[in-house]
Amino acid sequence: MLPGSLELILNPLLTTLITGSVAIVALQPLGGAISEAIAHGASLAIDRGGLLVGAVLSGTFLPLVLTGLHQGLVPIHVELVQAHGYNALLPILSMAGVGQVGAAIAVLMKTRNARLKKVIKGALPVGLLGIGEPLIFGVTLPLGKPFLAACLGGAVGGALISYWKVATVITFGISGLPLALTIVTGKVMLYLLGYLVAVIAGFLFTWLLGFNDPEE
């Protein structure tokens, strides 16, 4: 029997140590197996899904960014690189931001609102570098239809990137044009071509769908 004061300290400590150790020993292999299964499933879906899977992944990525749910994909990026040595998911998802660049250029050419033009000119350079939030919250989302057009443009680019099996050697962190520096050998030009197509598609969808030009 331990003194009451000592028992008060040691009981919770020992309980935590024992249960924590058991949990690590029992659950760590299970967690590893689940992570590997997710990575394998993602790779299989991209490999076999081709155009359709690429379009769906990229076309729905901007709404995920709005809610912050895209952060949940980080472990998948990590597992893909660890399991295969490359990441085929990130180049697909990066096309979502590229489609938005095209949409923003279309808005820039059509709008007569000086303030909106100024916002776009300030946000486009970082958009090209893969930082999409200024364009989302400052341009496409408030206008409505350009946001949809950006998603559609990204879907077109993502479909091609998936079909061409473009992959990067990094887990996450950069997107847009800088991502081209990390693309696997032999796929860089295909990534840049997909980038160009996504910009054009985002531009055309925005031009066709139109938008209500805000008053000054």
Set out the residue ranges of the language-model regions.
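Signature of multi-pass transmembrane helix bundles
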Residues: M1-T60, G173-E216
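Short coil/turn residues that cap or connect secondary-structure elements
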Residues: L2, A26-L30, G68, G85, ...
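Transmembrane alpha-helical segments and their short flanking loops
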Residues: I76, G122, P134-E216
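Helix-loop-helix junctions within the multi-pass membrane cores of secondary transporters/permeases
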Residues: V74-G154
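Long, highly hydrophobic alpha-helical transmembrane signal-anchor segments
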Residues: G54-P75, E79, A88
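Transmembrane alpha-helical segments of multi-pass membrane transport proteins and ion-pumping complexes
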Residues: P12, T16-G32, L62-Q71, Q100-L108, ...
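Short hydrophobic alpha-helical membrane-embedded segments
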Residues: L69, P125-L129, T171-F172
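Short, amphipathic, aromatic/basic-enriched membrane-interface segments that mark the entry/exit
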Residues: A42-D47, F61-G68, L90-P91, K118-G122, ...
